């Protein structure tokens, strides 16, 4: 370990604090906004959008009119 003492040109000791190494702690990757969650959310949104388009093509009408026709 490095000592925090130096001697200047006049022979006087200069004691100073040694700064610790800065360590960036990674956030907990199991919760919150992180790359894995954002990618999963985007992929699920794309799958849902494609499923909606395929449903509209198969039924010949939009999803909202189809749901409204079932209510009447």
From Swiss-Prot:
One of its GO terms (cellular component) is photosystem II. A high light-inducible protein involved in photosystem II (PSII) assembly and/or repair under stress. Binds chlorophyll and carotenoids, protecting against photo-oxidation during PSII assembly. It is a single-pass membrane protein. One of its GO terms (biological process) is photosynthesis. This is High light-inducible protein HliA. It comes from the Bacteria. Keywords: Membrane, Photosynthesis, Photosystem II, Pigment, Stress response, Thylakoid, Transmembrane, Transmembrane helix. GO terms for molecular function: pigment binding. Forms homodimers that associate with PSII assembly intermediates containing CP47 (psbB). The chain crosses the membrane at residues 47-67. Its main location: membrane. Induction: Transcription is highly up-regulated 15 minutes after a shift to high light (500 umol photons/m(2)/s), declines by 2 hours to low levels. Upon a shift to low light (50 umol photons/m(2)/s) transcripts are rapidly degraded. Also transcribed in response to blue and UV-A light. Disulfide bonds: none annotated. Belongs to the Hlip family. SUPFAM superfamilies: Chlorophyll a-b binding protein. It is found in: Cellular thylakoid membrane.
């Amino acid at each position: 370990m490095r000592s925090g003492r130096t001697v200047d040109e006049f022979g006087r000791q200069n004691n100073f604090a040694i700064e610790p190494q800065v360590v960036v702690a990674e956030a907990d990757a199991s919760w919150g906004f992180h790359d894995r969650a954002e990618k999963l959310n985007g992929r699920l949104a794309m799958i849902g959008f494609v499923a909606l388009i395929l449903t509209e093509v198969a039924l010949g009408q939009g999803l909202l009119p189809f749901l409204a026709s079932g209510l009447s």
